[in-house]
């Protein structure tokens, strides 16, 4: 509050940060200023975190200077920091308003496991599918829930890569007349795609449709959606849309032939 009163609202966040560093130092309060740390899983860097402060290894304040209100993305950002630093308490502070606005947050860790799922018939390489699911399952079992989508994408990449399969990050493809369009899925062994979502309720139709778009333009037969929610984790196998339609047409034809022969 003293920093807000001394500086006034609405300036660059860095000014408030520097003033807080000076105030904490003068008061003899132990703190880390913008500590940058890597999240490493099985020797592979999955993400990098840099909170504004870690104070007395007890709580994490994050400084903002906003025109509007705190958003869910701000909360997710702080929860990621708390999970990584293994701290429960954090504080969002907004220097953008006439009065100092702050919100105290408490992080609670959750663990999860995937329900055992057999690859469906359209999966052309069941062994690779099983390897992917097992690797990612071990990762979520070890790490627990709470990270954002970008962090989980890095963790999934690290988990799969650590057990052998080749992983291509952000593959590109030609879409209609547009060259080099980047897809957010991971491509595994040039065989399938993996799409990662997080902090939503569950895998939904949009998630499946997005992966199908990636499969279509990357010319891959199948893929897996992994979702890491607030309290649960789940997965779904997805087929290339044209392959799926072809299979459905074949089943209808076969069904029609059976009906004719029975008459």
Give the ranges of each region predicted by the language model.
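A short mid-domain helix/strand-loop element embedded in enzyme catalytic domains
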Residues: 125-133
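Active-site metal-binding core of divalent-cation-utilizing nuclease and nuclease-like domains
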Residues: 3-58, 98-109, 125, 137, ...
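Residue-level marker for well-ordered alpha-helical positions
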Residues: 18, 75-76, 134, 154, ...
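Nucleic-acid nuclease catalytic cores
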Residues: 60, 64-111, 197-248, 252, ...
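Long, low-complexity, intrinsically disordered segments
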Residues: 258-263
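A short, charged helix-loop
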Residues: 112-120
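Short, structured coil/loop segments at alpha-helix boundaries
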Residues: 41, 70, 122-126, 208
